[in-house]
UniProtKB/Swiss-Prot annotation:
It comes from Haemophilus influenzae (strain PittEE). This is Thiamine-phosphate synthase. The gene is thiE. The keyword Transferase applies. 2-[(2R,5Z)-2-carboxy-4-methylthiazol-5(2H)-ylidene]ethyl phosphate binds at T149, Q150, S151, G181, I201, T202. GO terms for biological process: thiamine biosynthetic process; thiamine diphosphate biosynthetic process. Condenses 4-methyl-5-(beta-hydroxyethyl)thiazole monophosphate (THZ-P) and 2-methyl-4-amino-5-hydroxymethyl pyrimidine pyrophosphate (HMP-PP) to form thiamine monophosphate (TMP). SUPFAM superfamilies: Thiamin phosphate synthase. It is an enzyme of class 2 (transferase). It catalyses: 2-[(2R,5Z)-2-carboxy-4-methylthiazol-5(2H)-ylidene]ethyl phosphate + 4-amino-2-methyl-5-(diphosphooxymethyl)pyrimidine + 2 H(+) = thiamine phosphate + CO2 + diphosphate; 2-(2-carboxy-4-methylthiazol-5-yl)ethyl phosphate + 4-amino-2-methyl-5-(diphosphooxymethyl)pyrimidine + 2 H(+) = thiamine phosphate + CO2 + diphosphate; 4-methyl-5-(2-phosphooxyethyl)-thiazole + 4-amino-2-methyl-5-(diphosphooxymethyl)pyrimidine + H(+) = thiamine phosphate + diphosphate. Its EC number is 2.5.1.3. Belongs to the thiamine-phosphate synthase family. Signal peptide: none annotated.
Length: 226
């Protein structure tokens, strides 16, 4: 059985759209940030490349970038997850896939491969968590958005940090990673409330010093585990 908790302490999510402020070469921007984040100590990376500022409409370039990100993650022994795109995840042999409530059902994903694919599931409501708790195909929940976020178009209602505590109090036992506007100052409380880790985008991609910011986030998350 996979030890999912070990990969969740600092879960980095990004695509080319999150690094466009760094210049015109979208692929190089993301690879630069990812390498610095890996040096800083991320424990997992989710390739989430979507939206009008991404490579979504140039599939060949997007696939090539995904493979480069995958290879970089493997150099550091960090799991590489693909967001939503199940076919891409399977084709390039990603370590996992993360899907939302309206994406391919997790039972179908699990049936597509006999490899030990990590499957994450986005949760925004208590009833969703209760349903997912009983689905053996799901390895962890992505809970959010915790705070307002600019990283998603039309984000769902914010939940607040106490929602993590609520999930634990009602008996949700699956590993949880909190996402959505999470910053360094929030990490300790989210971990205390029962999150197995935090997922961040701009806290890393927009940091003045990516490696240092990543290191601080990792240390804050690890501090709770001591």
């Amino acid at each position: 059985m996979k030890n999912i908790q070990k990969i969740l302490p600092l879960y980095f999510v990004a695509g080319t759209q999150d690094c466009r402020h760094l210049g015109e070469n979208l692929s190089e921007n993301l690879l630069f940030v990812l390498k610095q984040a890996l040096e800083g100590g991320i424990t997992c990376f989710q390739f989430r490349d979507k939206g009008k500022f991404s490579l979504e409409h140039t599939p060949s370039a997007q696939k090539a970038l995904a493979m480069s990100c995958r290879d970089l993650c493997r150099e550091y022994g960090v799991p590489f997850i693909v967001d939503d795109n199940v076919d891409l995840a399977l084709e390039i042999e990603a370590d996992g896939i993360h899907v939302g409530q309206s994406d391919m059902p997790v039972q179908e994903i699990r049936a597509k491969t006999d490899k030990p694919l990590i499957i994450g599931w986005s949760v925004n409501r208590l009833d969703e968590a209760k349903i997912g708790e009983n689905l053996a195909e799901i390895d962890y929940f992505g809970i959010g958005p915790i705070f307002p976020t600019q990283s998603k178009e039309n984000p769902k209602p914010t939940l607040g940090m106490a929602f993590i505590q609520t999930l634990r109090n009602v008996g949700i036992t699956k590993p949880l990673v909190a996402i959505g506007g999470v910053k360094l100052a929030h990490v300790k409380t989210l971990r205390e409330f029962g999150a197995d880790g935090v997922a961040v985008i701009t806290a890393i991609t927009h940091a003045d010093n990516v490696q240092a910011a990543t290191k601080a986030l990792r240390e804050a998350s690890d501090e709770y585990a001591k």
